[in-house]
Amino acid sequence: MLDKLSKHKTMFYERVKEIDQILFSQQQAKQTQLDNLSNNNASGGFFSGFMKMFSPLSTPPNSSSNNNSNTQQAISQETRKLCSVNNNRHEPIYNQYTTNSQVIRSFPAVSSIGQSSTNMYNSVNICDGISSSEKRSPTPPRNRSNSNDKILFGHYDALGSLPQNNMGHYQQPPQQSSQQQQQPLVPKQNSVTALRNTTSATSSTTTANNKKPSLDQIPELKGVDRKLLDHILNEVIETKTTNWDDIAGLKDAKQTLLETVILPSIRPDLFNGLRAPCRGILLFGPPGTGKTMIARACASQCNATFFSISAGSLVSKYHGEGEKLVRCLFAAARYLQPSVIFIDEIDSILSARSSEEHEASRRMKTEFMIQMDGVSNMNGKEDRVLVMGATNIPTELDEAILRRFTKRIYIPLPDHAARASLIKQLSHGQNMSLSETDINKICVATEGFSGSDLTALCKETSMVPLREISMDQLISIDARKIRPIVLKDFQSSLVHVRPSTSQDTIKKLEKWNESYGTFAKGI
């Protein structure tokens, strides 16, 4: 079957080539005759002879006075196809054929580049119907999610938006100027997505001035290494809105954060000069008391960019790269302001300096303190960047760091009312049968528990009704037939779940709070 098809293709190819050669020969002959007639100097000789040869409606030379009107008749359509008045001709059709003996056909086409129509030949493969001029690189998938291509290269969003030709294939849209295709490198809006697109630009991308894209075009990011900036942007957390109601208790801490963080963002005209908001807030207290959630709530209420930094974010194996990461962190925070830089377990990064520590750690701490003071900010404006640190061991922090954290807020263990509120929040939507008296009894029994300890207790209690059911019944039982959780289940779970913070740790933290802590003062 394939041999027959190949044979027919070859025969058809030869036949088309012969026809084209005949047409080309006729064109040459007609052109020669036309040139000979043009040399005739007799009055009306050119048109009368021309119409005699090509037009069936022409009259003999010896006819009446209708010769003048006949000589002004238009050239026939057949003559227009075979010859050209301006002595220009098209190249033979077979010169455009492919060399692999493909079955092809030729037809006059119109240029699709937005210019005037041109009578040009366009070779088309009959087997697959794809024009050779339309062969291009594979079209990207319909659903494109890479915003970097849309911003820096100006690619088209989807294949479905492209027009179709008469063969049912997609056509490339008209080419636009480089100024319309290329978007400016510097983002118009200081968003994390736009900044990530800028850092992911390849070296082959060029701007309107044929220069490689550089972060130096952004004043806040001048001199920042692209790879380090991309590493810092990975620490940005984009979470759902966290409200103050999600945090149980901590009335004094909420009041202090309200006047130092939330109100200055709402009324910046009132908080300037001596009322200017502080640059650093230290949250210290036992583990599991919600220090991270408080920082997220502050960033959410201020609509700020939230950087979650740990020791691994600023420590590098390369010599001298730690301080560069610190500088890059504050540069990105200033560009994306308002920003909140939250450093969990800050004592692991900014501990007290000593002569035995490594030189790289000392330089990194020094750079952090310089950036936190804002010495490198030369624009004269107040940066809306807040540094929040959380630690369980505030005694390990360097004194110079403590000076920069002007607000040091103690986050204690939840009291009786806070534990009751937290238990109600955790039991919301669960099958629990607890009265107010039962909740009070649970709060009394959980004295010294942190928020994470109470969460672990509730999870352990929720498994008690399931353990009473055999494995065979548990596979097929209806969830609505499982009995609710009662006070007895909490009492049995208290045997397995114990508080994680010792009383000695609580006393040390309370003593440090009396010496260095900040107490809330109501407005």
UniProtKB/Swiss-Prot annotation:
Pfam families in the cross-refs: AAA (PF00004), AAA_lid_3 (PF17862), Vps4_C (PF09336)
Cross-referenced CDD domains: RecA-like_VPS4-like
Cytoplasmic side, ranges: 1-41, 59-523
Signal peptide from the UniProt entry: none
Residue ranges, compositional bias (Low complexity): 57-71, 171-184, 193-210
Keyword Transferase among record annotations: no
Intramembrane region(s): 42-58
Membrane topology label: Peripheral membrane protein
Entry annotated with the keyword Nucleotide-binding: yes
GO CC term (a single one): microtubule
Substrates-to-products reaction catalysed: n ATP + n H2O + a microtubule = n ADP + n phosphate + (n+1) alpha/beta tubulin heterodimers
Main EC class the enzyme belongs to: isomerase
Main location: membrane
Region of interest (Disordered), residue spans: 57-77, 129-218
Subcellular location per the Swiss-Prot or TrEMBL entry: Membrane
UniProt-listed Enzyme Commission number(s): 5.6.1.1
Swiss-Prot/TrEMBL GO biological process terms: microtubule cytoskeleton organization
Alphabetized Gene3D superfamilies for the sequence: 1.10.8.60, P-loop containing nucleotide triphosphate hydrolases (3.40.50.300)
UniProt subunit comment: Homohexamer. The homohexamer is stabilized by ATP-binding. The homohexamer may adopt a ring conformation through which microtubules pass prior to being severed.
Free-text function comment from the UniProt entry: ATP-dependent microtubule severing protein. Stimulates microtubule minus-end depolymerization and poleward microtubule flux in the mitotic spindle.
Name listed for the protein in its UniProt record: Spastin
